[in-house]
């Protein structure tokens, strides 16, 4: 019987299997940031051991960092402490750190791929839910807890139970105005925020293989939002072209050897998945969430579901979400005013996202009622945006390109949305209070965010495209 992509990568990393228990899995790369690493470093220090393979760990501060004035001391005490502690720990244990001011600093899931740290066939972990981003390269990548961060620092291994496999096949061509973010929001809306629980997802089909690497990262990034352990896409020429020449990519003969191996990383034609779902790209429109989990999503031109259409077991959650958001069952969102637009995060803070946003707003003006946060995912993205003149296009339209960080994706830094206000966000989570106490989040694509930013209200971007 053939093997799935997940099985091939998993089997290549099993050190040993525990009878009737988990496997001990070798971890190729661990990415760390300032929030989930202090306790892990404290743990290995208390035990009197070092980092087993420091060259396989890469650190960068992202969650707590300000997106303006990064040359100045961080104002908030806890944020400053955590960023300083990361620097101290990396220096003490010999871990590579891209600190504030470094040319490669940024959101950890943007930095990994753009530096060539992320490669096909790897196992990659991070104390962060959206580690699944790296699965776009055909790697097994997943988020772990702080105690597991410590395990990997100490041993470069992790005990893991093998997940089931879920194949999500999407064929056809995406319509104008529909992007990768809409694809993943559509899938999550179809299967719910818990529909992927217990599975590792492989995305495939013509609609997936036609996407750029940055678009594929957007899709894999949000795998966790359907409850899945992670998501993967088989590497192909698009993958290889993206990686080639990057700082830590293999060079010379090693590149040829690597590509030869990477070309074996696909699901065999006779591989058996535990579950398969198929979708038609033509059915997907520009998406927007209306509730308090990413599964509460609709095409922007559709109405919020009626209460009668909601399963009995979900009605309490549905009503609670609508009450928090200030919406009603059956409402149309078209025309509703919003207060904030956030472009950024590990989901949509890459150069293609900035290009898409800037191209749309060029020659237009930010609506007067909109507060905008335009945040590149890394210093490299920021540098590229400036080189392309994106900062000037944004400025002429009334927007400001800020410095890199997680920003308004989560309320752990200065970029917070005030209570009761609506933020149209290109990030990955719309939980209660995610962007600030009482903040109301609506998840969208960068293209839809751009349309709303210049309109001041929720619109269907397709009606504004030539």
Swiss-Prot record:
Signal peptide: none
Protein's pathway: Amino-acid biosynthesis; L-leucine biosynthesis; L-leucine from 3-methyl-2-oxobutanoate: step 2/4
Needed cofactors: [4Fe-4S] cluster
Broad class of enzyme this protein falls into: lyase
Residue positions binding [4Fe-4S] cluster: 346, 406, 409
Keyword Amino-acid biosynthesis: yes
Catalytic activity: (2R,3S)-3-isopropylmalate = (2S)-2-isopropylmalate
EC number annotated for this UniProt entry: 4.2.1.33
Keyword Ribonucleoprotein applies: no
Domain of life of the native organism: Bacteria
Pfam families in the cross-refs: Aconitase
Summary of subunit composition and partner proteins: Heterodimer of LeuC and LeuD.
Function: Catalyzes the isomerization between 2-isopropylmalate and 3-isopropylmalate, via the formation of 2-isopropylmaleate.
Protein name: 3-isopropylmalate dehydratase large subunit
Record gene name: leuC
């Amino acid at each position: 019987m053939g093997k799935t992509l997940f099985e091939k990568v998993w089997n290549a990393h099993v050190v040993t299997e525990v009878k009737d228990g988990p496997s001990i899995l070798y971890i190729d790369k661990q990415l760390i940031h300032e929030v989930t690493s202090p306790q892990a470093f404290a743990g290995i220090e208390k035990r009197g051991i070092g980092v087993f393979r420091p060259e396989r760990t890469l650190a960068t501060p992202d969650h707590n960092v300000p997106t303006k004035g990064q040359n100045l001391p961080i104002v908030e005490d806890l944020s400053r402490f955590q960023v300083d502690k990361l620097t101290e720990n990396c220096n003490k244990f010999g871990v590579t750190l891209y600190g504030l001011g470094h040319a490669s600093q940024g959101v950890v899931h943007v930095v990994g791929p753009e530096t060539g740290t992320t490669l096909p066939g790897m196992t990659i972990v991070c104390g962060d839910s959206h580690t699944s981003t790296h699965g776009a390269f055909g790697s097994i990548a997943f988020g772990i807890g702080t105690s597991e961060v410590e395990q990997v620092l100490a041993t470069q291994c992790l005990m893991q139970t093998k997940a089931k496999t879920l194949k999500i096949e999407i064929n056809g061509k995406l319509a104008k105005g529909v992007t990768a973010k809409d694809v993943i929001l559509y899938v999550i809306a179809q299967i719910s925020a818990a529909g992927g629980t217990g599975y590792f997802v492989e995305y495939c089909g013509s609609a997936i293989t036609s996407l750029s690497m940055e678009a594929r990262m957007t899709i894999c990034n949000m795998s966790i939002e359907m409850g899945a352990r992670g998501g993967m896409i088989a590497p192909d020429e698009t993958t290889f072209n993206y990686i080639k020449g990057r700082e830590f990519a293999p060079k010379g003969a090693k590149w040829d050897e690597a590509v030869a191996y990477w070309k074996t990383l696909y699901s065999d034609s006779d591989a058996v998945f535990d579950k398969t779902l198929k979708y038609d790209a033509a059915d997907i429109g520009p998406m927007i969430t209306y509730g308090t989990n990413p599964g509460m999503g609709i095409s922007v031109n559709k109405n919020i579901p009626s209460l009668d259409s909601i399963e009995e077991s979900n009605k309490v959650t549905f009503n609670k979400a609508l009450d928090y958001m200030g919406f009603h069952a059956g409402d149309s969102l078209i025309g509703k005013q919003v207060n904030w637009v956030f472009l950024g995060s590990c989901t949509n803070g890459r150069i293609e996202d900035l290009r898409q946003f800037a191209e749309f707003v060029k020659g237009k003006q930010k609506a007067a009622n909109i507060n905008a946060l335009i945040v590149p995912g890394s210093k490299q993205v920021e540098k590229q945006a400036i080189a392309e003149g994106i900062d000037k296009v944004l400025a002429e339209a009334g927007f400001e390109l800020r410095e890199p960080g997680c920003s308004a994706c989560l309320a752990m830094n200065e970029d917070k949305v005030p209570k009761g206000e609506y933020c149209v966000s290109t990030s990955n989570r719309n939980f209660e209070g995610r962007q600030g106490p009482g903040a109301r989040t609506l998840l969208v694509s960068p293209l839809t965010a751009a349309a709303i930013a210049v309109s001041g209200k929720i619109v269907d971007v397709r009606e504004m495209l030539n």
